[in-house]
Amino acid sequence: MHLVGYAWLREAMQLSAFPLHLPAIVQPVTRLKKIGQTLAVPSAIAPAADDLLGHVLFALKHEGVNLAILAQALPKIPVAALENALQEAPNGIYIRKACYLREAFTGEEVPQHAPVRGAFVPLFDPKRYVTRPGTRNSRWRVEFNGLGDVSYCATVERTARLIELQEHDILGRAKAFMESLPPVMMDRAINWAYLHETKDSFAIEREAPNEDKSRRFIHLLRQAHERQPLTEEYLVALQNATVSNPYDLAAAFRHEQNHLAGALQGAAGVTYVPPPPELCRELMEHLMQFANEAPNQIDPLVAAGIISFGFVFLHPFMDGNGRLSRFLIHQALCRAGALENGLLLPVSVAMKREERLYLEALQDFSRPTRDFWDVQWIDFGKLAFDFRGDAAIYRYWDATDCVIFTMEMAQHALEVELREEAAFLECYDAVYRAVDERFDIRGSDLANLVMMCLTNDGFVSKHRRKQYQYTVPTEVFDYIEQTAQQVLSEKHAAQEKRQ
């Protein structure tokens, strides 16, 4: 048994690439099939062990498109090898793709002895990948239909889970749900969403924003509905509005190396190193172009996941990247026109609840990337960084799991956060109205007691009874409890009936 395709190229050519999720391995089988975490390959169709181009063509045909490996492997294959293969199959789909990519990566032409004929072929199979309208190369009759361009491109595979989430129509259901609410209730639910999206986006960063910082971030969230295109100037303004330390305010994308660190000291504590400054600034141009186009070309939630995680992986600022990356989910959905009437899906609230899964999604990229950096401790607060990898690991990345996580959080934000808050507001109104009609209680006291009772499973605690004993009669406490328990019981019964 031996490796073939991308796994062989990665190992034999010692390429800077992440381990494959499904390496192709020759096994005693009669046809290609998935066995466990490998792609079992019959020896009859396996390329020769030393045939570089053969492994590239095998991979393109049977394993999809891995640009991170192809960008490093194809430039090392002599032009003559591609020229000979092209003569044998002048209109072959996979040799055309290989020639097209090699020219794109190197700028060096592969000679054609006759013009390529036949229909245009998509570089990415639309049945396997999420794709978008592409740019056509008439020389090789190949259409680049990836999620980005040849210099920066994410891939999203159409897995069963992704398809399931898309069929759920999360954004359509969110719109329908909000439209089903009375106007006043809808406004209150939206205001709650903005407030808690702000609070939990900061909480993920282990920060509690003051009132001024919260107000500024809420203003930014509302501003996203203006659909302003992403530019360096706009992102700098956003960063300045979300960072309070004057020494961390950016004037442009970073010109120095940054990193993320854990609890350990020195180099051992460095958990992620983003791309070097020059590469970061280049890739941000491509990401911003994608962000300004893709939300109107593909599923907005798919675009939002790529933009958000792509931004945080590039880390273009020295501080504020995390909360800006979550803001960009909202910005992408607004740009697509998917959130109307000021609607916001509080994805940060969902992410805070699922913080472990959020960290895992980030670490799927950050951990293997860290292996390509040599970090040396110089002094406290001073580290030296030496990138030993290839820029391809930052240029081309698999965003499938990041997109699925983003969609799951959007679904959670709708089905749990927004629906629960709307139900809570409905219960609150019912209890408040019933008590207010029967007793003459100060409005602020009644509002606080109803709120505290509902969040305490229908009971007013001894502490609260004592706190309000001189302004609220005992029978009012009892009636609040009685009414709250009845309203909560009716709500639970209605939920069970719907299920």
Please annotate each region the language model reported.
Residues 1-318, 323-499:
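FIC/Doc superfamily catalytic core
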